[in-house]
Amino acid sequence: MKKSAPVPIGIVGASGYGGVQLVKLLQNHPKVEVVYLGGDSSAGKPFSSIYPHLEHSVDLKIESIELDKIANKSQIVFLSLPNGLAWKMAPNLLEKGCKVLDLSADYRFSNLETYQSWYGGERTDQKIAATAVYGLPELYRDRIANAQLIGCPGCYVTASLLALSPLFKQGLIVPETAIIDAKSGTSGGGRKANINMLLAEADNSVGPYGVASHRHTPEIEQICSNLAGYDVKVQFTPHLMPMVRGILATVYGTLRDPGLVREDLLTIYNAFYRNCPWVKVLPSGTYPQTKWASGTNLCYLGIEVDHRTDRVIIMSAIDNLIKGQAGQSIQCMNLMMGWEETLGLPQLSFYP
């Protein structure tokens, strides 16, 4: 049987941490070939001059961002760019027949007014934005499979929603009691220079940021509201940890039925995620660690009930650059192309 030609892939914004994760993962994908890497400040440079450890496997130069050229070369385009840039490119690429996966916040919101109030800027792509599908496969697998434009979730959002979704979908917690305490490694801040990410600043220190104002908050609330059927507000506080990668989100909510026990919640979560190969619900009394998910597309969920306070506690661990970014976008691509959801994605972490 003749082997089919690989699907050509373009990556715009290849020089950042999200971009290099995409390149690395797609190099090992059996059905695609990366044919275009795009960037502005790095245009003309060999990709290996930015990431020398990939010199033996990636023989491409960073090219200037020219949409016609990208569309002519690529069937699928990943946009790994800062917020506010993808929406200026996606309509043109879609018009030329490309499938587009956006890793920024530009296409995550069903209401562009919400996007503008948190991210700023004007938008003139309302019609295109209305066609975007939210790229969390565990919730929207069928819609993703039929989409041309995907708005991939944020990293904190992915960890938080995978913990919260069964609670809101099943109406298990009292409205307005959801609290998310999340911790992330420094790679979540990207590759640009940032004083807070310097070793001397971040090492041996843990601190909150974006308190009561983090831009992932409305994204979490949007999906939780859709699941619950009413407007949901959550309390979300992220923290920076002295580690490179990983997110641990610990979610709290007051149970509507204080008679529920841990085994009840385990049954509910296992049923909710029974067809989700990338979500692992841990056995009773086992709680996740970020190291378990590092380098994989997995999400580990631990479950506990505190009968003293009538609260459920869900702990969610992911790799912020894989399940929280590049890996999840490839998971969406697999669904869009009718391939196995697990194709080309890592399942085993480096341990210890």
UniProtKB/Swiss-Prot annotation:
GO terms for biological process: L-arginine biosynthetic process. One of its GO terms (cellular component) is cytoplasm. It catalyses: N-acetyl-L-glutamate 5-semialdehyde + phosphate + NADP(+) = N-acetyl-L-glutamyl 5-phosphate + NADPH + H(+). Its EC number is 1.2.1.38. It comes from the Bacteria. Pathway: Amino-acid biosynthesis; L-arginine biosynthesis; N(2)-acetyl-L-ornithine from L-glutamate: step 3/4. InterPro entries: AGPR_AS, AGPR_type-1, NAD(P)-bd_dom_sf, NAGSA_dehydrogenase, Semialdehyde_DH_NAD-bd. SUPFAM superfamilies: Glyceraldehyde-3-phosphate dehydrogenase-like, C-terminal domain, NAD(P)-binding Rossmann-fold domains. PROSITE patterns: ARGC. One of its GO terms (molecular function) is NADP+ binding. Transmembrane segments: none annotated. Keywords: Amino-acid biosynthesis, Arginine biosynthesis, Cytoplasm, NADP, Oxidoreductase. The active site is at C155. It is found in: Cytoplasm. Coiled coil: none annotated. Catalyzes the NADPH-dependent reduction of N-acetyl-5-glutamyl phosphate to yield N-acetyl-L-glutamate 5-semialdehyde. HAMAP family: ArgC_type1. Belongs to the NAGSA dehydrogenase family. Type 1 subfamily. This is N-acetyl-gamma-glutamyl-phosphate reductase. It comes from Trichodesmium erythraeum (strain IMS101).
